[in-house]
Amino acid sequence: MASLYITKNGVSLGLKANRIYISKEGEETKEIPIHKVDRIIIFEGVKISSNLIQYSIENNIEINFLKESGQYLGRVSGGEHDRAEIVRKQVLLTSDENFRVEMSKKIIKSKLSNQITILLRRKKIDESITKNIDLIKRMKVNIENCKSVEEIMGHEGISAKEYFEGISKTINEEFAFDGRSKRPPKDMFNAMISMAYTLLFSEINSIAASKGLYVYAGFMHSDKKGHPALISDFIEEWRSIICDSTVITIINKKCIKKEDFNFNEDGSVYLNKNGRKILVEYMTRKLNSEINYFGKSMTYREALSRQIDSFIEVLKNDDVSLYKVSNTR
């Protein structure tokens, strides 16, 4: 089964004889057997027929909607599990301060370990990033003694600044950037990682919702109307090893160029349709590539699913130690 990404404006999706028909300006360009698709991701400006939406709901094919900028808008799905007991336990525990602190420690320490790994791989390019690595290591140690989620996130914020400074020193000069910028991204690197984070966010959101979790009740990120806070929690430790490493690969291989971006008068920078196509292709490859996750070889997609299973075990047993983090080497 595969995810179907539609990134181009003016494209229409329809359903006929159990096949998805993709057309533009009235002319069919492609058809795909619907049984080969388990998720459809469409960007702003794409039309989708009501019969395809109905079929998707009835057959548990999720449809995700993204803005042209890559911002996640929402999803349509059917057949989600009725797991009221798990949801009650989730809401109860995500309101428990001790649980919130211990889960946040586990995830953010894993996130920092993965950031250190990414920087160590690039240390030979610029030895000066040793100081960035050392500071992140200190923040990781400090987190162990934190008494609140806010304190943990303060250390995470310092680490993020050091991490992105280190990345900027070691990538192609054309893509160098001055820190993390979002809503809107202000340079090509930030445009790419913002889009990559959205693609990963929708992937994790689909997995978590399909397993019956209430995606709006998180333990680390604060509740916001309409925002799946739990997914913002889950994604943290995976950002660097899935998204950032993918973007660095694209830059290193010179697969993307300035012409693949839109530079706007307000200073914002976004991928254009060709740029989105390139990023989607490489993110799909990454998610289908293998990782060693707790002694077993599996794809990143499978690891994401296994990790969410481990979170469900945490809820069932009220035991944070059962959560399997994503540390890589």
Feature roles, as predicted:
Residues 20-21:
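Hydrophobic residues embedded in beta-strands of well-ordered beta-sheets
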Residues 34-48:
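Extracellular/luminal Protease-associated
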Residues 78-81:
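Short low-complexity, flexible loop/linker segments enriched in glycine and/or proline
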Residues 1-16, 25, 31, 73, ...:
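Active-site helix-to-loop segments that bind/position phosphate- or nucleotide-bearing substrates
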Residues 40-43, 61-67:
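Short hydrophobic alpha-helical runs that function as membrane-insertion/retention elements
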Residues 49, 70-75:
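Short gly/pro/ser/thr-enriched loop/turn and capping motifs at secondary-structure boundaries
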Residues 56:
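Globin-like tetrapyrrole-binding proteins
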